[in-house]
């Protein structure tokens, strides 16, 4: 019998939050544990039923107040190491030395070398990168699932009156994968995905009859279970400024959206707007009951960058591909090879990573065509050349986008993404101008 995570947690007598945190603490692939619409996989069901007592202990511990001393005594590890892990991963939850939410004794023990092989025995080897639905971002996946809970769990509406979202904004720097996550949301709640084309934003004449975005929305409202995706949401829904040239089409879209948004929940319609930043968006749009679900989409962290580099280098290659043989000869078919390069790619977007791998593939092919051997060395020289080429999008404007995004993510959801936000702050700091503190842009690119 297929069960969603909410139903299954009740059956186990373990909180849903604990199951989600457990998957993150033990670095399990989401696709090994949950289907795209958050149903429990057979593999995870078998593990959970056979280890129900362990999960209950994990659940009890997660919700129990404890100090670093308590954790140290329980797992026989130095208090200083435990405090360092907590400070690195949960910088926002210090409260007089007592920890509760999100702090698992078992999770810390696992990071410090505790033996939990019995867990991994159920899942075999890690799912190959090329077979994964997405790489990393477990924290973002579960944050989104929490935001979508009214869609996934009707009991929230029936017993608590919690409304489904009518509008969602996914926001983040250019190239961070906002459309990917919008499609992932549609998949998670089993809605059809429609991307609004630029032509549909304009009022045009067809057979002497004017058609508008309002008419387009009227047609969509006749459908059921639809995600409407609107790119450049921050530009289209911008608050009017004095002496600003008004884009009449954008104003029509804004007014039509505000007029119809109350109908969205009733008709099972959700509009997702994609924005670089939230500042400047018309306040009426962000009002409760409208676009009040805000989902930050971060550039990948260092580990995610290494995994993405390997994924993009091996994507669509068959087992006899020449490039794959060259990668294997250099041990570049494994994540450790890419860690040094990933370390240098501070605040790189997903798009920049793809640009890097495309550039590197071309350079490797050029060397192969010249030397006709699979024994080519993937040297630091060609890695650095590809890195420099892909960094062309790392402009002052992009870095300012990242800084604004960080400010907004910190204001809206620091409690859920504290470690990711602090890491990104440190990476951004490496680009800040040291000699010209008065500059308005405040960033430069270090050329090596």
Which role does the model predict for each range below?
Residues 1-13, 57-70:
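Primarily a LysM-type cell-wall glycan-binding module
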Residues 5-6, 16, 20, 68-69, ...:
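An amphipathic alpha-helix signature
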Residues 338-352:
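A short helix-loop-helix "switch/interaction" segment in the helical subdomain of ASCE P-loop NTPases
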Residues 80-127:
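Interdomain "pre-motor" coupling segment immediately N-terminal to P-loop NTPase/helicase cores
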Residues 47-64, 394-398:
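A short, Lys/Arg-enriched interface patch at domain edges and termini
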């Amino acid at each position: 019998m297929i069960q969603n995570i909410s139903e299954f947690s009740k059956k186990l007598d373990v909180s849903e939050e604990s199951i989600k945190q457990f998957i993150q603490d033990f670095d399990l692939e989401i696709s090994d544990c949950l289907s795209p619409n958050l149903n429990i996989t057979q593999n995870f069901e078998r593990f959970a039923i056979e280890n129900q007592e362990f999960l209950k202990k994990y659940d009890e511990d997660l919700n129990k107040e404890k100090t670093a001393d308590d954790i140290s005594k329980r797992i026989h590890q130095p208090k200083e190491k435990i405090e360092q892990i907590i400070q690195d991963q949960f910088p926002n939850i210090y409260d007089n030395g007592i920890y509760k939410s999100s702090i698992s004794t078992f999770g810390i023990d696992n990071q410090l070398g505790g033996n939990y092989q019995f867990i991994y025995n159920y899942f075999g080897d890690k799912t190959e990168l090329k077979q994964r639905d997405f790489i990393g971002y477990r924290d973002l996946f579960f944050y989104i699932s929490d935001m979508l809970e009214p869609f996934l769990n009707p009991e929230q509406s029936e017993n608590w009156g919690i409304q489904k979202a009518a509008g969602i904004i996914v926001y983040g720097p250019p190239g961070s994968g906002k459309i990917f996550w919008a499609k992932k949301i549609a998949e998670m709640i089993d809605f059809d995905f429609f991307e609004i084309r630029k032509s549909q934003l304009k009022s045009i004449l067809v057979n002497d009859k004017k058609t508008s975005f309002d008419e387009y929305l009227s047609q969509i409202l006749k459908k059921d279970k639809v995600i409407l995706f609107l790119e450049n949401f921050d530009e289209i829904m911008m608050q009017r400024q004095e002496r600003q040239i008004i884009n009449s089409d954008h104003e029509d879209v804004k007014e039509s959206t505000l007029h119809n948004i109350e109908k969205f929940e009733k008709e099972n319609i959700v509009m997702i707007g994609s924005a670089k930043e939230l500042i400047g968006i018309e306040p009426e749009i962000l009002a409760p009951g409208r676009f009040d679900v805000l989902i930050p989409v971060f550039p990948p962290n260092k580990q995610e960058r290494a995994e993405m580099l390997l994924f993009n280098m091996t994507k669509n290659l068959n087992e006899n591909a020449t490039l794959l043989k060259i990668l294997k000869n250099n041990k570049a078919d494994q994540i450790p090879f890419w860690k040094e390069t990933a370390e240098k790619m501070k605040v790189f977007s997903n798009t920049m990573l793809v640009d890097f791998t495309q550039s590197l593939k071309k350079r490797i092919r050029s060397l192969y065509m010249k030397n006709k051997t699979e024994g080519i060395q993937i040297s630091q020289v060609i890695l650095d050349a590809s890195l420099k080429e892909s960094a062309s999008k790392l402009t002052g404007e992009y870095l300012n986008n990242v800084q604004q995004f960080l400010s907004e993510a910190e204001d809206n959801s620091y409690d859920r993404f504290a470690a990711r936000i602090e890491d990104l702050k440190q990476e951004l700091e490496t680009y800040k101008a040291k000699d010209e503190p008065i500059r308005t842009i405040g960033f430069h690119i270090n050329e090596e």
